[in-house]
Regions:
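Extracellular/oxidizing-compartment recognition motifs
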Residues: 1-341
Length: 341
């Protein structure tokens, strides 16, 4: 049974918060227990505060009119006799992907609010599934798009929401129609983080600070800051820089709204905090950070986490010509950067 927060879906013109679903349940057995989940959109799955996802951007990017993929998780040993907290955070993925009419995603027949279907099983018996016993609330993610970026307001966080049994501010979900596509188990290599890269240089501009991560790559930012409530931080990502900041010409189109070209926004709460986007992905060498002070503009403020499918090498290449070696290195990094499933 598929459930969603509602029928309204996220667009550039009208932002809709990513929904967080929650269910409290008891489990008085230590037998084999599994969770099967699929989503139209993307999901993050949490059990008693721990994230279960095997992969970034789960379950798999697909056209839900044709194929929808599901994942299975073995949760034996992770359950309590009483008050287990199961949470599902949904993002838009490709179901609501804005592309400024380049590939006509805006008019796709499958466009809808993100939704998911889940079964919790003990052995072969389904104990419960996604239904109206799940409750739903807005998450602090106020906008998410796989390419355009993500916007997050830390002041909307619900304290300890992934572990607390409190259901205050949660309401009933909407039971919705299933997708048209065939349901298939996901057997692809997971999308994983490949280290974390610090800036090799930081340069002040008229509007902020440019962080140079040394090479073009794909992935997500990791922001760490001590801030005051309400401080707004804008993160713009690009492959090149111009005279007054990052240059989007290699990654945008004539119709593009530049406020939605690889642009993340983080609204701070009080104190020390960290942020990594959940449902977006950027290709860049440079990040322009706006809204921070000179004291905050340190290398520790922003790092970059390369993210790509977990694909291994089957051979290595090395020769006595350093130019050729460098070209091979760049080519391999470019190949990995373009493999998300």
């Amino acid at each position: 049974m598929y459930i969603a927060k509602g029928k309204e879906y996220n667009t550039i013109e009208r932002h809709v918060n990513a929904p967080l679903f929650k269910r409290i349940f008891d489990c008085k057995t230590n037998e084999i227990s599994t969770i099967k989940i699929t989503a139209v959109g993307l999901y993050r799955l949490f059990l008693n505060g721990k994230e279960l996802n095997k992969s970034w951007f789960a379950p798999y990017l697909s056209n839900p009119d044709e194929i929808v993929f599901y994942d299975e998780y073995d949760v034996i040993g992770q359950l309590k006799p009483k008050n287990n907290v199961l949470c599902v955070l949904l993002g838009n993925g490709f179901v609501n992907n804005n592309d400024f009419n380049i590939w006509q995603n805006e008019t796709a027949t499958y466009r809808s609010a993100p939704k998911f279907d889940l079964q919790f099983k003990i052995g072969d018996e389904t104990v419960f599934e996604s239904d109206e016993e799940f409750l739903v609330a807005d998450s602090p993610i106020t906008f998410d798009d796989f390419r355009c970026g993500e916007r997050y307001d830390a002041n909307l966080e619900i304290e300890n929401v992934l572990e607390s049994t409190s259901l205050e501010n949660f309401g009933k979900p909407l039971i919705v129609a299933p997708p048209k596509g065939e349901i298939i188990k996901n057997s692809a290599q997971p999308v994983v983080a490949a280290g974390e890269r610090s800036a090799v240089a930081i340069k002040k501009t008229e509007t902020g600070y440019i962080y140079d991560f040394g090479v073009n790559d794909t992935g997500i930012p990791h922001l760490k800051i001590n801030a005051k409530k309400g401080q707004k931080i804008d993160l713009y990502f690009a492959e090149t820089v111009g005279g007054n900041g990052v240059d989007f010409r290699s990654i945008s189109f004539a119709k593009s709204n530049l406020e939605y070209v690889q642009h993340d926004v983080y609204i701070c709460k009080d104190g020390i905090q960290e942020y990594k986007p959940s449902f977006t992905w950027h290709g860049c060498r440079y990040a322009e950070v706006c809204g921070i002070s000179a004291e905050q503009a340190t290398k520790a403020l922003l790092t970059f986490i390369p993210v790509h499918s977990s694909i291994g090498k089957i051979c290595r290449f090395q020769c006595d010509n350093e130019t050729i070696n460098k070209l091979v290195e760049i080519t391999l990094r470019s190949d990995k950067s373009n493999v998300i499933f």
